[in-house]
Amino acid sequence: MSLGRLGLVQAGQPSKQCPTCPTLAEMTADATATAADIMAGKTAYVRGEKLTGTLVPITKIDVAEEGIKFSYSTFEEVPEVFDFSNVTDLSYIFDTCKSLISLPSNLNWGKMTNVVAAFRGTKSLNDEVNIEPLDVPSLEGIFQRSNISKILNLSVQSAYTAFNAFESSKLTEIGNIDLPDIVTATYAFSNIPIVHFPKINIPKIANCSFIFYNNQSMQSLAYWDFSNVTVATNMFKGCSALSSIGDIIFLHTALSLADSPNIDEDTLRRFGGFANAAGESGVAPLKSLGLPAAALTFNTAAQTYLETEGIIAKLTDENWTVNFANSM
């Protein structure tokens, strides 16, 4: 008897991105069994067929061997009967488990090869993120729309994208984030309630469009390295409370802060300082370095200060177009 689809997967709309998840056609409407039921030999579901009678008690179920995905399950904690020691593919494994409050204790992050959307939609998850080492190609949607509020440590090698990684999560506190190979992070930290976003290591980032989109509570960004950034469309769209960017590293592409009327003078002055090479603090002198012209857009509240301090003149001399608007 295959245990690949035990009734611990609740009947419901499976993830359309998860080809291995059971479909409604494969499950009866009440296809929900508990680990206690299984251990007591009461009821189980295999490929949607209800089995009753006495089952041989199971001490452990190998999640990897049985190919089990728990998407849409309703339990708060993963029953101990499930053994995760051989799991390498976490993709979609707890997708939309809305009642799950904690992660399995025996996850071996060093063995994982796929974590796409692993904990997406876990709206009750109370655990702190403490993940290292992790070597995967993508962090796409790993904690998207989850209840995660704190990252202690997130250290990931090889990952190219962090698309939607923490989008619409409850993230308010970030410790160490080391993402040395991430190139695109669209919406990665968008629509979160964080107030102060610390310095993170993400040196190869090229596309940070919408990365902080709609972070209405975010007041400060400690540091951002633009050395390799080629696209920053709507990076700060909806960041109405943003007042400070602690360090701007080699900005040389178009950027808008039109949605941020409270940018402080220290931050505005940083746009008047030039950086002649990647890794240096300041804005690139585009003309002097032979780089393409680009535009900077500020909220109209900053116009008087930038004019008075001569920052607009400095920027336009170096092929920057300076615009002002009340919103993006």
Regions found by a protein language model. Give the residues of each.
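Negatively charged
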Residues: 2-5, 10-328
